[in-house]
């Protein structure tokens, strides 16, 4: 499996190509998209296109990330690790495997939540706001014509014309070959 150092190098390399940190994380740890019945075709095209660049990392993990502009976390598509968050009225965001890790006065809690499989929790530090999963991903998948690229550049194996040649019959019997 991919270790922390390899994952960090992979993230860094993709950031150097001009992608945003949320986009890199979507590529590295995609949602379960192939058989998702209600996912938009543009989001499926994004995941299909990027699946040609690298294999998905399926965890199990809750992966925190930051680059100074964003701080966030995402849960792998299997969702086997718990990730819970609390947002306080005085501006703190706390994420951990369980609630109650940090003592917070009940009247200071603005909201509690749980990260779901394949979903991203993101704080835009420049705007000082939490960005919803749909908002993040919809803006990223509309950035380029992924559907067009998939249609014009990906050829399924079932569409490749080929002929199967029968292999010649072996002329030697088993005992002769063993000698």
Report residues per predicted region.
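Residues that form generic nucleotide/phosphate-binding pockets
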Residues: 12-13, 27, 149
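Single conserved hydrophobic/aromatic residue that forms the stacking wall/gate
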Residues: 1-11
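Short, solvent-exposed cationic patches
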Residues: 4-6, 97-98, 153-156
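Conserved mixed alpha/beta core segments that line enzyme active sites in large multi-domain catalysts
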Residues: 20-124, 137-139, 171-175
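Short, charged beta-turn/beta-strand-edge "cap" motif at the junction between a beta-strand
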Residues: 6-8, 101, 125-130
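Extended C-terminal subregions enriched in glycine
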Residues: 15-18
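Long, low-complexity intrinsically disordered regions
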Residues: 164-179
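Terminal amphipathic helices with adjacent charged low-complexity linkers/tails
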Residues: 122-167
């Amino acid at each position: 499996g991919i270790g922390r150092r390899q994952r960090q190098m992979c993230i860094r390399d993709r950031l150097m190509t001009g992608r945003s940190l949320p986009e890199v994380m979507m590529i590295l740890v995609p949602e379960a998209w192939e058989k998702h019945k209600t996912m938009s075709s543009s989001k499926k095209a994004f995941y299909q296109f990027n699946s040609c660049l690298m294999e998905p990392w399926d965890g199990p993990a809750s992966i925190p990330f930051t680059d100074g502009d964003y701080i966030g976390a995402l849960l792998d598509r299997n969702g086997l690790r718990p990730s819970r968050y609390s947002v306080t009225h005085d501006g703190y965001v706390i994420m951990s495997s369980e609630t109650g890790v940090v003592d917070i006065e009940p009247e200071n809690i603005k909201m509690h939540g749980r990260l779901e499989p394949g979903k991203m929790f993101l704080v835009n530090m420049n705007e000082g706001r939490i960005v919803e999963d749909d908002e993040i991903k919809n803006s990223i998948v509309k950035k380029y014509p992924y559907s067009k690229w998939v249609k014009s550049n990906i050829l399924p194996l079932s569409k490749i014309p080929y002929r199967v040649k029968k292999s010649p019959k072996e002329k030697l019997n088993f005992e002769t070959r063993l000698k």
